[in-house]
C-alpha cells in the first residue's frame, strides 16, 4: 500500500490490483476483482488508485481551503419503479419490464469504455495554475483507463457489463433478450450535443469538464438504482438466485466508489483554479464547473420526472400479459413514491394531471 503522502503515480500503479486468492468467475467468464484469503471481495485496480485519490483529496482541501465538489443529495429523486412496484410486477407474472431495465443498466455500463477515448487537452493550455500531483494530472495516466476497464471489462476479463447480464440471468432464469433494447438506447443517445455555455474556452475544454460533471451525476444517481436492484434481486420471493444475483450487484456497487471519488476530486481541482480562454483571459473554474454540472443535473431530473414515468407505463402496458392491464397499473401506481423536487427545480415538476411518480 503506497504512503498517502505520495501524489504522483504511474499508469501501471493506477491500474494495479490488490492481491487476491480466488478469482470471480461469472457464467464461465473470469471477471475483474476477486476474493482475499478471508473470502472478502476486493475491487479491481485499487492497490494504488484508492490511496492516491485520498491523497489528492487531502491535498486539495489543505491547499484550497474548500470542500470537495458534490452532486447535492436532494436532487436524487426516488427510484421508479420503486422496490415495491417491481416486486408487485414480478409476483403478478410481469417479468419483461425488469428484464429490460436490468439489460439497459448492463448496456449503459458497457458504454463506460468510451471514457478512455475522451480527448484531454494539455492542462497548461487552459489552466493557469500548476496541476502537478493532482487527479487532473492522472486522468490520462490511468484514471480514465481504470474507469473504462471497470465498466466494460478488459481483454478476456469481464467487467460490469458482463456482471449485470449475469445478475439478470441468474435472478430471472436466463430470459430472452430483445435486440431492440440496444437499438432503443442507441436511438436515445443519438441526440446532438447541447449548445456551449462557455464557447470562449473552446469546445475540447468544455466537453471535458461537461463530460466529467455529467458522468459524476450519473454515478451518483445510479447509486440509488444499484441499491434498488440489490434489494429486489436478493428477495427469494421474486429472484430465482437471490444470493448470487445480489452479490454481483453488491460487488459492482463497491467497484463504483473510486469513480465517484476521482471525478469529485478532479472537478474540485478545476473549481479551485483559474481557467484560460482561447485568447488567454481568466475565467473562474468554479463557475464553469458549477454551471455545467447544474445543466446536467437539470437534464437528468427532467428525464426522471417527466420522461421516465411515461416510458415505464408504456412498457408495462405493452408487455404485461394479464387480463386487465388497467387494473394492474392502478395497483402499480398506488405503490408509487410521491416526490417533490427542491424548490429551485420546481419548473421541472410534472405538469398537473401527469404522473406524480419519478423515474430512473
Residue ranges and their predicted role:
Residues 1-360:
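Non-heme di-metal
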Amino acid at each position: 500500500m503506497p504512503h498517502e503522502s505520495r501524489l504522483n503515480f504511474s499508469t501501471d500503479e493506477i491500474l494495479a490490483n490488490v492481491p487476491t486468492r480466488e478469482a470471480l468467475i461469472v457464467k464461465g467468464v473470469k471477471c475483474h476483482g476477486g476474493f482475499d484469503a478471508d473470502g472478502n471481495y476486493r475491487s479491481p485496480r485499487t492497490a494504488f488508485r484508492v490511496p492516491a485519490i485520498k491523497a489528492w483529496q487531502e491535498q486539495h482541501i489543505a491547499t484550497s481551503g474548500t470542500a470537495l465538489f458534490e452532486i447535492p443529495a436532494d436532487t436524487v429523486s426516488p427510484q421508479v419503479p420503486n422496490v415495491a412496484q417491481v416486486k408487485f410486477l414480478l409476483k403478478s407474472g410481469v417479468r419483461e419490464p425488469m428484464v429490460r431495465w436490468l439489460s439497459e443498466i448492463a448496456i449503459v455500463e458497457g458504454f463506460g469504455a468510451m471514457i478512455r477515448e475522451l480527448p484531454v487537452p494539455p492542462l497548461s493550455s487552459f489552466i493557469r495554475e500548476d496541476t502537478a500531483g493532482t487527479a487532473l494530472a492522472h486522468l490520462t495516466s490511468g484514471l480514465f483507463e481504470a474507469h473504462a476497464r471497470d465498466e466494460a471489462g478488459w481483454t478476456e476479463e469481464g467487467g460490469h457489463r458482463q456482471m449485470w447480464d449475469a445478475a439478470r440471468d441468474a435472478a430471472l432464469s436466463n430470459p430472452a433478450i430483445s435486440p431492440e433494447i440496444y437499438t432503443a438506447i442507441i436511438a436515445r443517445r443519438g441526440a446532438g450535443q447541447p449548445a456551449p455555455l462557455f464557447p470562449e474556452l473552446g469546445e475540447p475544454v468544455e466537453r471535458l469538464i461537461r463530460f466529467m460533471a455529467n458522468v459524476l451525476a450519473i454515478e451518483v444517481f445510479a447509486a440509488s438504482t444499484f441499491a434498488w436492484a440489490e434489494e429486489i434481486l436478493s428477495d427469494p420471493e421474486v429472484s430465482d438466485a437471490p444470493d448470487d444475483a445480489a452479490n454481483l450487484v453488491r460487488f459492482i456497487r463497491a467497484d463504483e466508489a473510486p469513480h465517484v471519488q476521482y471525478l469529485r476530486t478532479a472537478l474540485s481541482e478545476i473549481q479551485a483554479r483559474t481557467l484560460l480562454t482561447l485568447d488567454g483571459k481568466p475565467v473562474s473554474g468554479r463557475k464553469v464547473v458549477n454551471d455545467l454540472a447544474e445543466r446536467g443535473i437539470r437534464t437528468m431530473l427532467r428525464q426522471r420526472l417527466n420522461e421516465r414515468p411515461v416510458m415505464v407505463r408504456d412498457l408495462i402496458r405493452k408487455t404485461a400479459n394479464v387480463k386487465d392491464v388497467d387494473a394492474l397499473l392502478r395497483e402499480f401506481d398506488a405503490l408509487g413514491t410521491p416526490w417533490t423536487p427542491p424548490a429551485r427545480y420546481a419548473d421541472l415538476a410534472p405538469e398537473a394531471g401527469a404522473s406524480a411518480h419519478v423515474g430512473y
